[in-house]
Amino acid sequence: MNYDLSQKFKVYLEFSGKKYRIYGQSIGISHLDLGGGSSGSLLLNDKKQIAGIYFGVDGANNELGLAQLLRWKPETYHNDEARSVAYDLIFGNKNTTKYYAQFVKEHKTHLYEQIKQINNDEFRFVEKTKRHNLG
């Protein structure tokens, strides 16, 4: 089950006295509550690739585990997805004001050097907009 986090959580969430904007898609996994301290656990797909990051639960009895997807590219033939906007948790999208790749570029981290060397378009589809050019 996909959750549009901006609609589900009304855009902002407060944690430790700070407001955070929730954006993107998550996956809801029935009967999965990993318990306290498990936020940040990896969600793997059937090919053992990272698909998302576990962050919490939803439902009256915490019966639905939630994982933030790393990447979302909606299919236009699904009504629910047609209203969604493509995004990438690392590279952002046209609506993102701050994103992780921006941080790694500004601080010249090791990850930025690795990103520049990627030749696989599968991992760079958001970067192709003018705003997200990492080169």
Curated annotation (Swiss-Prot):
**Recorded GO MF terms:** ATP binding; RNA binding; RNA helicase activity
Record InterPro entries: Flavi_NS3_S7, Uncharacterised_MG067
| Family note | Belongs to the MG067/MG068/MG395 family.
Please state what the protein is called: Uncharacterized protein MPN_584
- Specify the taxonomic lineage: Bacteria, Bacillati, Mycoplasmatota, Mycoplasmoidales, Mycoplasmoidaceae
